[in-house]
């Protein structure tokens, strides 16, 4: 644990993880990746049959998370995690975090009482953009049958119309079997293979 948010700040709607703890130093590298330095860091981890130091020579540990350090009204710093850099894609000059977008869309759907049960954003290669997103979605039984797939797609596009262009899926695909593992993780290789198996008229 390197940061904590006061309950009153959470209730006021402050975004992020709160302020760094007293014995923690935080730093963003030139790629906006969060680095942590504290005496509470483990010295090393066991990897490939040997001890691999966790921190660099100056004591900084790279978290692998893209982040922002945002000043608050009382001049404290609030940590905001944007997403895992190993899951990020580059689209049209923007760094896009698919997992964060999935959570955002599910939240918006819940706010609008739309029966969207699961969504997974996956990248495909694009000559113009580098990569573009395609969205796999699973809806509650009966929604597509009642409204029609075209109407469902229109609803999803309206919800994402204010997003950055690089964040908006170029295509929406219904996937009735879409679900994470029992641990709540996505088997991205599996679903990427499923996506590639579809006969799609995608603009690359």
Stretches found by the model and what they are:
Residues 26-28, 65, 176-181:
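Active-site and channel-lining beta-strand-loop segments
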Residues 195-204:
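Acidic/polar alpha-helix N-cap and adjacent early helical turns
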Residues 19-23, 29-59, 84, 94-96:
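Conserved ATP/PPi-binding loop(s) of AMP-dependent carboxylate-activating enzymes
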Residues 1-14, 48-51:
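Active-site loops of AMP-binding adenylate-forming
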Residues 160-186, 203:
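AMP-binding/adenylate-forming catalytic domain of the ANL superfamily
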Residues 59, 64-165, 186:
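AMP-binding/adenylate-forming catalytic core of the ANL superfamily
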Residues 12, 22-24, 85-86, 184:
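A structure-centric feature marking long, well-folded core domains of fungal metabolic enzymes
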């Amino acid at each position: 644990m390197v940061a904590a948010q006061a309950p009153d700040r959470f209730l006021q709607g402050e975004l992020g993880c709160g302020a760094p703890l007293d014995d923690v130093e935080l730093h963003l590298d030139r790629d906006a990746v969060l680095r942590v330095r504290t005496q509470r860091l483990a010295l090393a981890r066991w990897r490939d049959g040997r001890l691999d130091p966790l921190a660099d020579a100056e004591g900084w540990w790279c978290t692998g998370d893209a982040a922002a350090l945002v000043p608050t009204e009382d001049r404290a710093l609030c940590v905001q995690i944007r997403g895992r850099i190993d899951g990020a894609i580059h689209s049209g000059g923007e760094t896009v975090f698919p997992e964060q977008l999935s959570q955002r869309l599910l939240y918006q759907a819940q706010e609008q009482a739309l029966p969207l049960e699961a969504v997974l954003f996956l990248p495909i290669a694009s000559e113009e953009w580098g990569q573009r997103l395609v969205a796999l979605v699973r809806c509650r039984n009966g929604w597509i049958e009642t409204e029609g797939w075209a109407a469902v797609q229109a609803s999803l596009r309206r919800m994402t119309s204010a997003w950055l262009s690089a964040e908006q899926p170029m295509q929406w695909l219904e996937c009735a079997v879409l679900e994470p593992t029992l641990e709540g993780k996505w088997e991205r290789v599996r679903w990427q293979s499923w996506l590639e198996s579809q006969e799609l008229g995608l603009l690359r």
